[in-house]
C-alpha cells in the first residue's frame, strides 16, 4: 500500500467526524467538585488527528458539523490557523451545540472525563453534506468510530467511505470507541465491522478491537486473521504500556515499545499516536519506524495538559526516540 500515490492531490489527509471543546482542569490532584479553573482546547478524535498531522506538516482537510455559535467559531478559527482546510466543515442551523468534555485530573492514574453530548451537532452530519469533489482531492480519508454511533452521521460516514473507494482514496479507520455514544455493544460491533471490512488501515486498542468483535479477551491473531480476509493492508493494535503491534497482509509483524514519560493525564494518547503513525507512513518511513513515531507522540501528549495544543512536531518526536534509543 502506497500512501504517496496521487501526489498531485490537494490533501494528504481528510478526517471525518467530531470536533468539540475540551475543558481541562487547571487544578491537578483534586476532584471535579473542587475544581474552579479550566482551560479550553479543541477536542474530538478526528479534529485532534487533523491538528496533529497538520502540525507534522501534512496537507489536511476536515469534514464535520459544528455549532453556529462562539464555540463553533473557536474550533473553525483554531483549525484554520493551522492551515487545516475547513471547506468540509458544516454549521448546524438547528441550534445544536458541539460536545463539551470536562476533564478531571486527580492523579496520573486517576483521570476522568465528564461528557456533555446530548443532541450534539457532529452526529447530525448528513450524507447530503458529504462532497465527492472534496473527498477525491485527498490521498487518505480517516474516519472515526464515534461518528458511526448515530444517524444521520452514520450514513454520512458510510457515504464518505464509499466515495473514497470509488476515487482510489485510501481509507483509514480509527476505532475511537466511546461507550457513552452507543446504545449497546451489538450495535457497535455491527457498524465497526462494516467499516473495518472496507478500510485499508485500521488503528485501535486491544479493548476497542474487542468491542468490534463483541467479546472480551480477544487476541491479535484471531483479529488479523478475520480482517485480512477483507480489504485491510495494515492493522495496528495498541496494548498500552506493553507497546503496540502492526500487522500487514503480507504476513509481517512489527512491535514498538511504549516510551516512558512523566504522565500527567491518560487521554489524548490515541489521537497523537494515529497522527504520528500516519505521518511516518507519508514520510516514507518503514512500518516499524512509523510505530515508534506513534508511541513517541503518545508519550509526549500524556505528559502535557492539553491534547490538541500538545500535539508534537516531527523534531520533538525524533528527539524523544533518539534519547530513548
From Swiss-Prot:
Enzyme Commission number(s): 2.7.1.92
SUPFAM superfamilies (UniProt xref): Ribokinase-like
One of the record's GO molecular function terms: ATP binding
Keywords annotated in UniProt: ATP-binding, Kinase, Nucleotide-binding, Transferase
GO biological process, one term: inositol catabolic process
Pathway(s) it belongs to: Polyol metabolism; myo-inositol degradation into acetyl-CoA; acetyl-CoA from myo-inositol: step 5/7
Any single Pfam family the record assigns to this protein: PfkB
Parts forming coiled coils: none
Reactions catalysed: 5-dehydro-2-deoxy-D-gluconate + ATP = 6-phospho-5-dehydro-2-deoxy-D-gluconate + ADP + H(+)
Keyword S-adenosyl-L-methionine: no
Top-tier EC class: transferase
Assigned protein family: Belongs to the carbohydrate kinase PfkB family.
Summary of the function given for this chain in its UniProt record: Catalyzes the phosphorylation of 5-dehydro-2-deoxy-D-gluconate (2-deoxy-5-keto-D-gluconate or DKG) to 6-phospho-5-dehydro-2-deoxy-D-gluconate (DKGP).
Record protein name field: 5-dehydro-2-deoxygluconokinase
Organism, as annotated: Listeria innocua serovar 6a (strain ATCC BAA-680 / CLIP 11262)
